[in-house]
Swiss-Prot record:
Family indicated by similarity: Belongs to the RapZ-like family.
GO molecular function, one term: GTP binding
Highest taxon of the lineage: Bacteria
Residues the record lists as binding GTP: 59-62
Name under which the protein is recorded: Nucleotide-binding protein Sfum_2066
Annotated transmembrane regions: none
Length: 286
């Protein structure tokens, strides 16, 4: 049984994530009281054997969550359950803007507190849980559709026999580092097609830009050597029980060089029969 706990900061996209898992045929429950979790999983195994994938949305609205989750998660692990924690977050100003747009009340807010204080309070309360997360996703630069697509790509092929799911991500340094990245490539040393007038308004998915970037010896050598490094490291990650690996390639704007490199690295890994998703985070920002 594959169990995913979706949690994180209020306003960071938990409901969107749960809907994405629902579309992937996960059995989904939002705000299940944490003390009921062991009993619920035991019931599924006993009376609902067709349920193999479960996604649970849990946050501070469930009052006993912060008090009970650590012991309950530990007990479940010792009982042999395989589960992971996805922690969603975003910058404080992003969360403020989202709450202002929806006019919803933050669950940690009171009539005497400001929204920003409620966000800081929740962030501090969830700090320990964040440190236990299997995956941390910063949704600040993602639209609702992009977050849903990211989860769909990552989990659509995951089953009980899957060893490692790999995501190769392109991004622009000018928009910030991707917090979910396990490894980051800085490819700003490569020749930049942005300064070629015929290529400036294209992106790295186009044949024209890809061919131009890959024409340089430095590019080809980098792709070959970094790909070889990953092929050596991935079996070690699998041996340690890692289930998800995010490799990020960054250039200045996230439109040209990083996109080409991400596609090539993903191709190298696919050639060796690894399941790989590619996500170009900042294409829409340029």
């Amino acid at each position: 049984m594959h169990v995913v706990v979706v949690t994180g900061l209020s306003g960071s996209g938990k409901s969107t994530a749960i809907k994405a898992f629902e579309d992937l045929d996960y059995f989904c429950i939002d705000n299940l009281p944490v003390p009921m979790l062991p009993e619920f999983l035991a019931l599924c195994e006993k009376d609902m054997p067709d349920i193999h994938k479960i996604a649970l949305g849990i946050d501070i609205r469930e009052r006993k969550f912060l008090k009970d989750y650590a012991k309950i998660f530990q007990d479940l692990e010792e009982s042999g359950y395989r589960f992971e924690i996805i922690f969603l977050e975003a910058a404080t100003d992003t969360l403020q803007r989202r709450y202002s747009q929806t006019r919803r009340v933050h669950p940690a807010a009171s009539s005497q507190s400001l929204l920003v204080d409620a966000i800081h309070q929740e962030r501090e309360q969830l700090r320990a849980l964040r440190s236990r997360a299997t995956r941390i996703i910063d949704t600040g630069t993602l639209s609702v559709h992009q977050l849903k697509a990211m989860i769909t790509r990552t989990y659509s092929m995951i089953g009980d026999t899957e060893l490692l799911s790999i995501q190769v991500l392109s991004f622009g340094f000018k928009y910030g580092l991707p917090f979910e990245a396990d490894m980051v490539m800085d490819v700003r040393f490569l020749p930049n097609p942005y300064f070629v007038e015929a290529l400036k308004n294209l992106d790295g998915r186009s044949e024209e830009v890809s061919s131009w970037v890959l024409r340089w010896t430095a590019t080809r050598e980098f792709v070959e050597e970094y790909g070889a490094l990953l092929l050596k490291l991935i079996p070690l990650y699998i041996r340690e029980g890692k289930r998800y690996l995010t490799v990020a390639a960054g250039c200045t704007g996230g439109k040209h060089r990083s996109v080409v490199i991400a596609e090539r690295i993903a191709g190298t890994l696919r050639d060796h029969n690894y399941f790989v998703n590619v996500f170009h985070r900042d294409l829409h920002l340029e």
